Amino acid sequence: MAESFVRLEHVFYKYEDTEKYAVKDVSISAQKGEWVALVGHNGSGKSTIAKLLNGLLFPEDGLIKIGHFVLSEKNIWDIRRQVGMVFQNPDNQFVGATVQDDVAFGLENHGVPHDTMVERVESALNEVGMQSYALHEPARLSGGQKQRVAIAGVLALQPDVIILDEATSMLDPRGRAEVMETIRIMREQEDITVISITHDLDEVLFADRVIVMNNGEVHSEGTPQEIFEQADAMREIGLGVPFIIELQEKLVAGGFETGSTVLSEGALLDQLWKLNSNN
C-alpha cells in the first residue's frame, strides 16, 4: 500500500483554560486523491483536526505530516501551500471587488507572476463553472455560487489537499448539491485529497472513507456502507443516518425485504425490483 499523503499519529490537543482534550490520541490518514469525511456531533474534535491539518493549531503531542513535511513552526508555510481550506460561511471569505479579483487574491500573496495568475484564475473558474461570473460582485451571487468561487480561489493555488470545514452547512439543498458536484469533479480531474468536516450525513455518502469522531477520539472508521450498516451505533453517539438508510429501515419494519444496505435511491429501487421479480 502507498504511503499516506496526510497522516496524524497519536495527536493530542487541548485549548487553553480547559482540562479536557479536544483531540485525544488520534491517528488517522488519507491517501493521495482520497475523499475522507470526518463526522461527529459538536465538540467531537472534527473541526479541531481541520485546524491542526492547516497549521492554524499545533498539537500538544503527536505527529502531523502532509506530503513530505512534518508540521512544525519551521515549515508551516510549506504545509499551508499544500493545504487549502473552504470554510462554513462564504460571505466571510471574500476580499475582492469582483469574482476574478477574489480568486486572484491568494495568488498575489504567493507572488505568482501576472501572466501565470491570469491563466490560473481562468482555469479555476472554468473548473467550478463560474467563468461567466468573473466580473460579477461576489455579494450578488447565491450561496452555492459563492462557495464555488471560494473553491476556485483554493484551486488556483494548486493545493494537494482541500479541507471542507462544514462548507455546505449554510447552503440550501440546491447550493449544497452544486458544491458537492463541483468537489466530486475537481477531485477526479486533479487527484486532490479531500477531507470534509461535516455533520451532514447525506454529504458523507460522497466520501471513499468515513471517520467518526466522538469526544475527541476516533469512534469508528470504514466505507460509508460499513459505517451506516451500524446505524444503531451511530445513534448511540448522537448522530443520525442518511435518508436512504432510514428509508430502508422503514421498509424492513413494514415487512419488505430490501437485501443488503445500499447508499442511493437508484440502487435501492434496483434491489427491490430484483427481489420482487424473484418472488
Curated annotation (Swiss-Prot):
<dbReference type="GO" id="GO:0005524">
    <property type="term" value="F:ATP binding"/>
</dbReference>
<keyword id="KW-0067">ATP-binding</keyword>
<dbReference type="InterPro" id="IPR015856">
    <property type="entry name" value="ABC_transpr_CbiO/EcfA_su"/>
</dbReference>
<dbReference type="InterPro" id="IPR027417">
    <property type="entry name" value="P-loop_NTPase"/>
</dbReference>
<keyword id="KW-1003">Cell membrane</keyword>
<feature type="domain" description="ABC transporter">
    <location>
        <begin position="6"/>
        <end position="240"/>
    </location>
</feature>
<keyword id="KW-0547">Nucleotide-binding</keyword>
<comment type="similarity">
    <text>Belongs to the ABC transporter superfamily. Energy-coupling factor EcfA family.</text>
</comment>
<dbReference type="GO" id="GO:0043190">
    <property type="term" value="C:ATP-binding cassette (ABC) transporter complex"/>
</dbReference>
<dbReference type="GO" id="GO:0015087">
    <property type="term" value="F:cobalt ion transmembrane transporter activity"/>
</dbReference>
<feature type="binding site">
    <location>
        <begin position="40"/>
        <end position="47"/>
    </location>
    <ligand>
        <name>ATP</name>
    </ligand>
</feature>
<keyword id="KW-0813">Transport</keyword>
<dbReference type="GO" id="GO:0006824">
    <property type="term" value="P:cobalt ion transport"/>
</dbReference>
<dbReference type="InterPro" id="IPR017871">
    <property type="entry name" value="ABC_transporter-like_CS"/>
</dbReference>
<dbReference type="InterPro" id="IPR030947">
    <property type="entry name" value="EcfA_1"/>
</dbReference>
<dbReference type="GO" id="GO:0042626">
    <property type="term" value="F:ATPase-coupled transmembrane transporter activity"/>
</dbReference>
<dbReference type="GO" id="GO:0016887">
    <property type="term" value="F:ATP hydrolysis activity"/>
</dbReference>
<keyword id="KW-1278">Translocase</keyword>
<dbReference type="InterPro" id="IPR050095">
    <property type="entry name" value="ECF_ABC_transporter_ATP-bd"/>
</dbReference>
<protein>
    <recommendedName>
        <fullName>Energy-coupling factor transporter ATP-binding protein EcfA1</fullName>
        <ecNumber>7.-.-.-</ecNumber>
    </recommendedName>
</protein>
<comment type="subunit">
    <text>Forms a stable energy-coupling factor (ECF) transporter complex composed of 2 membrane-embedded substrate-binding proteins (S component), 2 ATP-binding proteins (A component) and 2 transmembrane proteins (T component).</text>
</comment>
<keyword id="KW-0472">Membrane</keyword>
<comment type="function">
    <text>ATP-binding (A) component of a common energy-coupling factor (ECF) ABC-transporter complex. Unlike classic ABC transporters this ECF transporter provides the energy necessary to transport a number of different substrates.</text>
</comment>
<dbReference type="InterPro" id="IPR003593">
    <property type="entry name" value="AAA+_ATPase"/>
</dbReference>
<dbReference type="Pfam" id="PF00005">
    <property type="entry name" value="ABC_tran"/>
</dbReference>
<dbReference type="InterPro" id="IPR003439">
    <property type="entry name" value="ABC_transporter-like_ATP-bd"/>
</dbReference>
